[in-house]
Amino acid sequence: MPESLIAGIPVHFPFEPYPVQRAYMEKVIQCLRDGTNGVLESPTGTGKTLSLLCSSLAWIRTRQSEHQQQMVKMEKADFTGLGGGAAGGDLSELAKTMGRANNWGVPKVIYASRTHSQLTQAMRELKRTAYANMRSVVLGSRDQLCIHPEVMREQGNSNKTNMCKLRVHSKTCSFQMRVESRKDHPDLRGPSIMDIEDLVKVGQRLKICPYFASRELVPQADITFMPYNYLLDPKARKANKIELGNTIVILDEAHNIEKICEESASVQIKSSDVAMAIEDVTHIMQVFASGESQDMGGDEPKDFTLDDLTLLKEMLLEFEKAIDAVVVENAVEGTTFPASMMYELLGKANFTYGNVATIVSLLDKLVQYLLVASQQMTIRKGGTFTMLSDLLTIVFANKEDVMSKVYASFKVHVQLEEVKQGHGKQQGGKQHGGWLGKGTIAAATGSIKVAKIINFWCFNPGFGMEQLLNTQVRSVILTSGTLAPLKPLIAELAIPVAQHLENPHIVDQSQVYVKIIGTGPDRQQLISNYANRDNPKYISSLGQTILNVSRIVPDGLLVFFPSYPMLNKCVDAWQASGLWADISVKKPIFLEPRSKDQFTSTMEEFYQAIRDSKGAVFMAVCRGKVSEGLDFADRNGRAVIITGLPFPPLKDPKVILKRRYLEANRTRENQLLSGQEWYNLDATRAVNQAIGRVIRHRNDYGAILLCDSRFKDASQVQQLSKWIRGHLGDRPQCSPFGPIVRELRQFFKNAEANMKLPDERETDSPLETVCKTENEPIAAIPKVKREPGSNATFKSANESAIKVEMANSIKTWTPADYASAAGRKLGGAAPNAMDFMSRLDSNVSSIDFNCCMDSKSGSSGMVKIHKRERSSPTQPESSSQVSKKRYKLVENIKVEPSSSQVKEAPAERADFLRELRSLVTQDQFRRFGKALLEYKDGTYESFQALMVILLDVLSAPKVRYMLVGMRKYLKNEHKDEFDQKVGKL
């Protein structure tokens, strides 16, 4: 492939890069070289993904080459005199070998996007480049990767996750057990790039679990592909063992990144969920009391006791009572409270930072217990326990020392929910020992009509981004086709950005026709605001506009509405008036369905209809599946009509609170948007994304028709993507409908005559990335003339198998996805990577029963029991008796750190080595140097050899602080074992 020198780095690109691609790659390389962050916009169709992959991996490959040269030089270095002053040069080289803190070796790339279909497209792009032989891996969910037949039969992601955990824990999954012995198989470690489907095929062939096998590939991968939720949520990162130190994080399709950051930190719980959780606990207690637990859960002792259940039920009853006491003043819109109210509610039930890890662990064990029991009898599978676990995990995710930020960034909103009669009815209608709570009894008898919904909402996306930056990543690059305007985005995310870019489109001005249509054929104003959207004249005029445009636009026509209600309202009116039938005569009409199954079949029918000479119309909704993830290149989308601005619901509580948050926190320094500016921008970004479905590559062409007179307002125009603004001019105006019809007809006549046909452009499917990587420049392909009105038959990509089953297949993430992590440590809030060492230098507290150890230690916070240890069901049970009997609270006793703990190792490499040489003998220092050189490749064997030397040389109390200081020079995958070995000293 041709090589281009970009920002001093040789980049192999499939063809001579266009100016916009070169500018984009320069910005990427500058970010990686300087260790800074970037926000880069490049319109869809400009080869953004290809440019991103080639530039980042070219820089990685260059760094790898430099690193190898340095290692060769180090191998030739003379370390015989390391103990003396004459070896200053060699000492300097050894310091370079050690690298910076958390910076051993070459950085790695993490490429994240919204959906797995987008990740698959990116991996297909990578396969066509000169970097296809670089090591890569994709991380997916159990729902996508599991091949165990019984787990696959489970309904819902949460049930599959819990069933998988159960089988792994009980060692009854043969696929997972084979991973260790076959993880180095050539089919798994080979040079070929494997997407989700490829991983599943390899797993089936080797009879190993693709989910766990993919995790084994991560440490050696140069680039790892994963969905956003694996990356942005700190708990998900911990569960998937994702190390971010010295990594390059690329967030593609980042136009919704603020919302994703907010939603990953938000959670909801219903009082009806709490009531059902109480029922489930009560049922398990009844089973224990009757001695039937062996029948339900097998012969193994349970990981919880009857006393554990008693205490949990007391806490849930108190939580239910606290929720019942909340006064909702506005029954329609709900009532808003400060974030502290959530901690007060949970505190009344004794859910605290001190015991939340223990409670979450117990809830997870109960879910697994019910999963086993559900195989033998009809019983709920613990979904309410999962919801409670999600709530506690998210609410207590942040450490207590950042609570001021939490209070500023979150709000609690309480709404009322109608409850069905008899919902949550107790099985068998029995009350056991007076343990049915008031809410449970009321729900069972139908005496209450409403339940409360407790929402814990985050409104500060910068809160999550700050946590990401604190992991010591090298660079974060946010990129998309529709990020503009950039300043508000950067301000909300609150990250330092050194590089930013708004690229023009790669297509020529003559290939795009953009107009604002302010009136329909009958001169009725087109404006889809609240006051006009029910106007029959407006709806009729909009339908006539679409009818006239459908007569002119060849092939595919996309029509986007602000919302589903507006789409349905127009469809009903047009069907009643006959306009629907008139449009259908010109082109068959397809409507965007909401269900995944219907969506797949509808897309297949639409692509099939495009083959017909009439084409087809697809009516969809902004922010829907079609507007966010699909490619309508060439004939699939020759024009897009935007019927209105998709503003968020003005009276929605979340929208109201977001606007209030911005107004309350806006300053001149942080440059946050006002509430109204954010409201307008949210609508325009959805429009930009919908527009991006057409004009998908260098030789594509199409029309963009903005059918709402408000698009002429300067405030709206400035929020459109830069390349669209260029077509509207400095002072855009609404054009009369008649001239637009004539211009549009002439535009398509010229385009069909001068642009090359879609069948000449090689594609795999309409859903794949369209920026292909031909070996020759696209511009070199000769243009083919098509006679106007020709009914030529196209042998296009549509005639190949149309793969729509993965289109925009967004997997909804829940905290249950990370709750199953193997080797999980259930402390309070998840500590960061340096917490182990930083705690050696701080005050130490004694351990109480709330402290959870790793289950392997045999000293968990929850005590395993046998049946003989159960409390007697006939014994009077009170909360005080139970607590005294099973749980003993221990006061935290502070221990002052020793002098060796207080002292810290020098931060600079050269200073570190000089001090070490002054503390140890010449022979010890020589052994240390040799072991460090042998560790250059970072293999596990070389790590073990290095640890032997470190523990021998640096375990003495007076030099142990130097041992602690060595941690930052180790590879990330070796740090946990290092911590364990040092912790035993």
Swiss-Prot record:
Alphabetized Gene3D superfamilies for the sequence: 1.20.1160.20, P-loop containing nucleotide triphosphate hydrolases
Region (Disordered): 858-884
Localization, UniProt: Nucleus
Entry-linked Pfam families: ARCH_RTEL1, DEAD_2, Helicase_C_2
Alphabetical GO biological process terms: DNA recombination; DNA repair; DNA replication; male germ-line stem cell population maintenance; negative regulation of DNA recombination; negative regulation of t-circle formation; regulation of double-strand break repair via homologous recombination; telomeric loop disassembly
GO cellular component assignments: nucleus
Binding site for [4Fe-4S] cluster: C146, C164, C173, C209
Domain Helicase ATP-binding, chain residue ranges per copy: 7-303
Keyword rRNA-binding: no
This protein's record includes keyword 4Fe-4S: yes
Keywords: 4Fe-4S, ATP-binding, DNA damage, DNA repair, DNA-binding, Helicase, Hydrolase, Iron, Iron-sulfur, Isomerase, Metal-binding, Nucleotide-binding, Nucleus, Phosphoprotein
InterPro entries in the cross-refs: ATP-dep_Helicase_C (IPR006555), DinG/Rad3-like (IPR045028), Helic_SF1/SF2_ATP-bd_DinG/Rad3 (IPR014013), Helicase-like_DEXD_c2 (IPR006554), P-loop_NTPase (IPR027417), RAD3-like_helicase_DEAD (IPR010614), Rad3/Chl1-like (IPR013020), RTEL1 (IPR030845)
Function: A probable ATP-dependent DNA helicase implicated in DNA repair and the maintenance of genomic stability. Acts as an anti-recombinase to counteract toxic recombination and limit crossover during meiosis. Regulates meiotic recombination and crossover homeostasis by physically dissociating strand invasion events and thereby promotes noncrossover repair by meiotic synthesis dependent strand annealing (SDSA) as well as disassembly of D loop recombination intermediates.
Protein name: Regulator of telomere elongation helicase 1 homolog
